[in-house]
UniProtKB/Swiss-Prot annotation:
In the hair cortex, hair keratin intermediate filaments are embedded in an interfilamentous matrix, consisting of hair keratin-associated proteins (KRTAP), which are essential for the formation of a rigid and resistant hair shaft through their extensive disulfide bond cross-linking with abundant cysteine residues of hair keratins. The matrix proteins include the high-sulfur and high-glycine-tyrosine keratins. Residues 4-72 are annotated as: 10 X 2 AA repeats of CG. The keyword Disulfide bond does not apply. The keyword Repeat applies. Human have a similar number of genes as other primates despite the relative hairlessness of humans. It comes from Homo sapiens. Belongs to the KRTAP type 28 family. This is Small cysteine and glycine repeat-containing protein 1. It comes from the Eukaryota. Keywords: Keratin, Repeat. Coiled coil: none annotated.
Length: 88
């Protein structure tokens, strides 16, 4: 199922705040599942599971080394969320 009518986004949670004309126009994003592409919603970069409930929290690629911040919860194995803090 795609995001905001975009069929190429894999399994993502959809848009919570409406869509302004395409995959990259979501105002808010629901939680992503593994396989969601970065063009679904502007909050995400790369693919990871359980990320992106708001545009402020960004999905980063695969390891905590790409975050550039230390983590409070046993970082890091396969997923990484980053902006001001990293949470695995």
């Amino acid at each position: 199922m795609g995001c905001c009518g975009c069929g190429g986004c894999g399994g993502c949670g959809g848009c919570g705040g409406g869509c302004g004309g395409g995959c990259g126009r979501c105002t808010t994003c629901r939680c992503y599942r593994v396989g969601c592409c970065s063009s679904c919603c502007p909050c995400c970069r790369g693919c990871c599971g359980g990320c992106c409930s708001t545009p402020v929290i960004c999905c980063c690629r695969r390891t905590c080394s790409s975050c550039g911040y230390s983590c409070g919860k046993g970082c890091c194995q396969q997923k990484c969320c980053c902006q001001k803090q990293c949470c695995c």
